[in-house]
Amino acid sequence: MRAAGFGAGLITALLDILKGAGAVWLAQAINPGSHWVHTFAPIFAILGHNYSIFLPDFDENRRFKGLRGGAGGAPTVGGAFGLWPTSLAIILPLGALVFFTTGYASVTTMSVALFAIIVFAIRAASGLPWIDVLYGVLAGILLVWALRPNIKNLLAGTERVVNISLHGWLKAKREAAKPKP
């Protein structure tokens, strides 16, 4: 959304959510009897999102450094949606609350995995598969790993804050109130 605008960002986010959900749906179609396969399919979608073969990274001497990609937040939400569609109605509003309160996209991204863990743990406590909790844990590990630079920025107080959030608004208000030299 930062680079291409709101519309392109929204379409990209929706397609990335479908990437995670589609992995589950494809696994369910190919192997309907194995919930383990359904649970691990979106993990591989997240890995493919974070380390895309279509985004190789090279140094200044054109030597291969690795694969680039996103952090995996949207495919994580999509994977949760694919495993249990109602999870979307829980995770998205909570993620929006985190985003519009903190103003940090990285914190929001990490929180969606935490929300998936909580949602699936509550479901598992009522007799549904515990393997879905493992999905949330593994997705969370992948998200935290991908967001290591952002975590460093958060700890240093240099992470970018979105102005449309409560935190961003308060920060802008404090800066505007500072006396000018």
Predicted segment positions?
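Membrane-cytosol interface at the C-terminal ends of transmembrane alpha helices
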Residues: 94-95, 140-142
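Nucleotide and nucleotide-moiety/phosphate-recognizing core
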Residues: 8-14, 19-64, 82-86, 95-96, ...
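C-terminal all-alpha effector/ligand-binding and dimerization domain
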Residues: 138-140, 169-170
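Interfacial segments of multi-pass membrane proteins
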Residues: 1-5, 27-31, 70-102, 115-124
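Interhelical loop and helix-boundary elements at the membrane-water interface
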Residues: 1-21, 50-74, 100-111, 146-181
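Loop-to-transmembrane alpha-helix initiation sites
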Residues: 89-90, 105-113, 127-139
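Glycine-rich phosphate/pyrophosphate-binding loop and the adjoining helix
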Residues: 125-134, 145-153
